[in-house]
């Protein structure tokens, strides 16, 4: 299953950009991953257009919270559905996602109840995806 991460704006914080590069390199061994940075003009339309045909997951503080193991189980469930060829994680800009945008997505997940910058949300997402893929490959998990 292809994983697409769509974010509004490139990371400007040097440590966030470094974190993205680190996890992007790690994930290349496990998954077909692409990260795309979109311009802030009409971000909802841009995110929806670029994710057309994918299973859309909006990342928003109002979404469903899951543990790493629950995310891994959800990935396994999505992979088991043959019609889903790609999953797109949609990270909005500073104002987050509107309720009408979230309704157009297949799911809304929360990385935390805390508000965080969108560039940090991308790093947290990639780190969790890395954990999910290592778990799926049978790596030991210290939380079990």
Cite the ranges covered by each PLM segment:
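S-adenosyl-L-methionine/SAH cofactor-binding core of RNA-modifying enzymes
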Residues: 30-88
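Conserved RecA-like P-loop NTPase ATPase core
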Residues: 5, 57, 92, 125
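Short glycine-/polar-rich loops that comprise or flank the Walker A/P-loop
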Residues: 1, 54, 104-106
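Structured adenosyl-cofactor binding patch, chiefly the S-adenosyl-L-methionine
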Residues: 99-143
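Short glycine-rich anion-binding loops that position phosphate/pyrophosphate groups of nucleotides
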Residues: 11, 61-64, 93-96
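Conserved strand-to-helix beginnings and helix N-cap segments that scaffold or border functional pockets
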Residues: 17-20, 68-72, 102, 122
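Catalytic beta-strand/loop module used to bind and position nucleotide/cofactor moieties
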Residues: 70-100, 107-116
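N-terminal beta1-alpha1 ligand-phosphate binding loop
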Residues: 1-23, 27
């Amino acid at each position: 299953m292809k994983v697409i991460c769509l974010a509004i704006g490139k990371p400007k914080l040097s440590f966030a950009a470094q974190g993205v590069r680190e996890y992007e390199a790690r994930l290349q061994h496990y998954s077909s991953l692409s990260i795309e940075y979109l311009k802030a003009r009409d971000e909802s339309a841009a995110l929806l257009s670029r994710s057309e045909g994918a299973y859309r997951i909006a990342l928003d503080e109002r979404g469903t919270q899951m543990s790493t193991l629950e995310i891994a189980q959800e990935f396994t469930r999505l992979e088991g559905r043959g019609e889903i060829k790609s999953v797109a994680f949609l990270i909005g800009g500073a104002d987050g996602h509107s309720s009408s945008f979230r309704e157009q997505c297949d799911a809304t997940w929360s990385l935390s109840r805390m508000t965080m910058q969108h560039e940090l949300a991308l790093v947290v997402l990639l780190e969790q995806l890395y954990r999910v893929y290592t778990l799926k490959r049978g790596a030991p998990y210290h939380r079990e």
